[in-house]
Amino acid sequence: MSTWLLPENIADVLPSEARKIEELRRRLLDRFRSYGYEMVMPPLLEYLESLLTSGGNELRLRTFKLVDQVSGRTLGLRADMTPQVARIDAHLLNRQGVTRLCYAGPVLHTRPRGLHASREQLQIGAEIYGHAGLEADQEIQQLMLDALHLTGLKKIRLDLCHAGVLAALFARDAAAAERGEALYEALAGKDVPRLNELTDDLGADTRAALRALPRLYGDASVLDDARRQLPALPEIARALDDLAHLAAQVKDAEVAIDLADLRGYAYHSGAMFAAYVDGVPNAVAHGGRYDHVGQAYGRARPATGFSLDLREIARISPVEARGAAILAPWKQDDALRAAVGALRDAGEVVIQALPGHDHVLDEFACDRALVERDGAWVIEPR
């Protein structure tokens, strides 16, 4: 086998892509900071049980596992940074009020999550802890849309769902709860034949409600249909009210209600959302409320957040990251060295052409040149 081959769905990041990823990363982290989010950097590697406190079987299957040569315990390479950030909030920071945290780092998946998806993603996201009200959900929702607009994406569609609807149906019907994992998979995949098979022997109300969920998709008027077709349970009514409120706050994106879009249902506890753009089959960002995740670390806190894959965003973003630069000659000249140093200190990119390579400009747009005029080094347009 060739020594230069990489595993399937794993790829190097070359200069042009890396520059674009870094440009987007800086934009997003700066925007998070403008909202008051503090950055944290959890480790890539942890004990497996710490990484799998939530997320169900899906997260377990996506997590790479290995044996620690020091302790003999099983370690995991993180597949999602959200549980790690929840651990930091619950166990290390231990604050009592509202905490806003953000992060950016690689995650690894045993299998790709979607069509053309990489198994090594660069996850970036933001989380709010300590506030159970819809204000936190609204802020996270708006921050996610702000972030996507900063990347230059257009015609964004925000799909809203709520984990409370399915949870209420399971709480009322023990038989449905017992096959919850299978029902979740059928709903998330909109596998109607499988859903019909799983619900054949359930109570009439539960069966009708579960079979209605894949059809409850569309604009905000779908919520009125949901009130008519779903059981009149207080938990379902509150969930639909939450979605109506969040949908009404969105002014800069199309909003759709999809009560079967249950990505991450295993650890979500409230409103869930995913962002889509034309021409991309998978969600470009997703998030939601997950109030119980911190419980495994000794302190359950209200929490909501979102994340996205920067590598995927960079692939579809129209942002141009080819930076302007100044071309300078390579010459043993103290005045030239001082001029180049001063320009770099001022934030300019200065590329000194090595002897014999004056025509090679790499991928920078050298729109200016540093030239000697009357004994002084000055900048001129190229």
From Swiss-Prot:
The answer to whether keyword Iron-sulfur applies is no
An annotated GO BP: histidyl-tRNA aminoacylation
Gene3D superfamilies xrefs: Bira Bifunctional Protein, Domain 2 (3.30.930.10)
Major location (coarse): cytoplasm
One Pfam family name is tRNA-synt_His
Any one GO MF term held by the record is: histidine-tRNA ligase activity
Q: Annotated pathway, please? A: Amino-acid biosynthesis; L-histidine biosynthesis; L-histidine from 5-phospho-alpha-D-ribose 1-diphosphate: step 1/9
This protein's record includes keyword Amino-acid biosynthesis:
yes
Which keywords describe this protein according to UniProt?
A: Amino-acid biosynthesis, Cytoplasm, Histidine biosynthesis
Q: List the GO cellular component terms.
A: cytoplasm
| Stored SUPFAM superfamilies | Class II aaRS and biotin synthetases
What InterPro entries does UniProt report for this protein, alphabetically? aa-tRNA-synth_II/BPL/LPL, HisRS-like_core, HisRS/HisZ, HisZ
Where can this protein be found? Cytoplasm
Cross-referenced HAMAP family: HisZ (MF_00125)
Query: Function of this protein?
Result: Required for the first step of histidine biosynthesis. May allow the feedback regulation of ATP phosphoribosyltransferase activity by histidine.
What is this protein identified as?
ATP phosphoribosyltransferase regulatory subunit
Q: What is the scientific name of the source organism? A: Burkholderia pseudomallei (strain 668)
